[in-house]
């Protein structure tokens, strides 16, 4: 718990001195979330989760602002000594990771092992051993566990034998692996099949778990927006094609339709999309 800071005011009068201790106002924690993140909590479950959460605002916030926010959040970074150079390096790593061209063919264990090794090699290109351990240690361990699960499924064991061997293998892992939320989610994904496992591994490694979940929400929001906008265009076209309306009446009805179909903050965007739909 932080100790309350004290402001000391010393007033000297002749040979007498009086010292007053006045409690200062506690520092207000800066909200580093972007506008689109206000319905979420900052993901500081691990240094990597925090870095990925911060990077997901790129394009919405200036790079320099993101960097300053990240570097100032020492509590979320733990032992990781992060500066602007290391954060820029992390972004370059993420870009290189996205460019990895490795074909994954279903449950092919060789493909999964190739992906795992390629990720480890890429990490070594950009980071020291200590940085890799602090940033990627848990996810590397979880990915290795997923590979072990895949190997068990290819060795001819019965379903019950696989479950028992898997439990035995987990019992040998560090406590944080056995108890982590990420591990429980991984176990759920593994139980659904190898295709889900592969998707999980690639998404989490690219953007982190919180980032993957946020992208899924954004995808759903985009799909809903597209549905509403396409319906709006149909109604708008009906107004434009109505020969009984003057140009001014059409303009007013379309304006009313736009304002009742979308939030005020979207109106300028809708007008721009209308121009695109009209061919310019």
Curated annotation (Swiss-Prot):
Membrane topology: Single-pass membrane protein
One GO CC term, this protein: plasma membrane
Keywords, in A-Z order: Cell inner membrane, Cell membrane, Chaperone, Lipid degradation, Lipid metabolism, Membrane, Transmembrane, Transmembrane helix
MF terms in GO: unfolded protein binding
Single GO biological process annotation from the record: lipid catabolic process
Cross-referenced HAMAP family: Lipase_chap
Function: May be involved in the folding of the extracellular lipase during its passage through the periplasm.
Family of the protein in this entry: Belongs to the lipase chaperone family.
NCBIfam families per the UniProt record, alphabetical: PRK01294.1-5
Protein name: Lipase chaperone
């Amino acid at each position: 718990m932080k100790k309350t800071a004290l402001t000391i005011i010393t007033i000297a009068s002749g040979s007498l001195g009086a010292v007053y201790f006045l409690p200062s106002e506690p520092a207000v924690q800066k909200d580093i979330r972007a506008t689109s993140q206000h319905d979420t909590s900052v993901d500081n479950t691990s240094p990597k989760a925090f870095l990925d959460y911060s990077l997901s605002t790129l394009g919405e916030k200036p790079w320099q602002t993101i960097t300053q926010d990240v570097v100032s959040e020492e509590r979320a970074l733990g032992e990781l000594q992060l500066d602007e150079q290391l954060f820029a390096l992390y972004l370059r790593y993420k870009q290189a990771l996205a460019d990895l061209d490795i074909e994954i063919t279903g449950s092919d264990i060789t493909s999964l092992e190739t992906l795992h090794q390629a990720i480890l090699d890429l990490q070594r290109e950009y980071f020291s051993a200590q940085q890799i351990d602090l940033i990627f240690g848990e996810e590397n361990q979880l990915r290795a566990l997923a590979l072990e699960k895949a190997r068990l499924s290819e060795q001819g064991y019965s379903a019950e034998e696989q479950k028992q061997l898997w439990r035995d293998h987990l019992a040998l892992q560090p406590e944080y692996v056995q108890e982590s939320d990420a591990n429980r989610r991984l176990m759920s994904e593994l139980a659904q099949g190898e295709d889900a496992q592969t998707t999980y591994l690639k998404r989490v490694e690219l953007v982190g778990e919180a980032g993957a979940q946020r992208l899924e929400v954004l995808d759903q929001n985009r799909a809903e927006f597209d549905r509403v906008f396409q319906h709006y265009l149909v109604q708008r076209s009906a107004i434009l094609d109505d020969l009984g309306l003057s140009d001014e009446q059409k303009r007013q009805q379309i304006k009313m339709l736009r304002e009742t179909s979308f939030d005020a903050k979207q109106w300028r965007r809708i007008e721009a999309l209308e121009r695109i739909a009209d061919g310019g």
